[in-house]
Amino acid sequence: MLNGTVISYGNYDKASERLFGGIGDGVLFKADFDKYINFCVYHDLQMVFDFGIKLSEKQLAKVRKGIAKLERNITRWKPPYQLATENSPISDIADFDDYCSSLWNGTHARFYKFKSGRFKTYFVMSTNCVFLADYILSKAGTDIVKTAGIIT
């Protein structure tokens, strides 16, 4: 979370899934922290553990710069339910079984796809959410994740 916004990366486009969801288009989303936690707890029925890292102002500036670099390589993408409601306001979420549609319905998160580069394709064993977090945090000089082998 940064400035009250959750940033997540995964294979959220069900239409692009291959290998049982292990591979697909890399999708980044941003959501309001409180709305996202509420969604996770009440929609997904998940217990949420929130961890933080204390960064200096200099490190935080580097993290923001890393995020800005990523943002130059993304383009807006809309989940199926969001597109449906734009075309017909009476669309029913019950007609959509993809996670990103439910997430958008519950949080109005903004979704993005990568235009090119290593995050364009999500792969559960390497190019995943942990790898993206490490990419961002490494800009601040942290060495939290060992990125050899399977990254989890």
Label every model-predicted segment.
Residues 1-124, 152:
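Non-catalytic ligand/cofactor/substrate-binding and regulatory segments of enzyme domains
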Residues 119-151:
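Active-site nucleophilic cysteine motif
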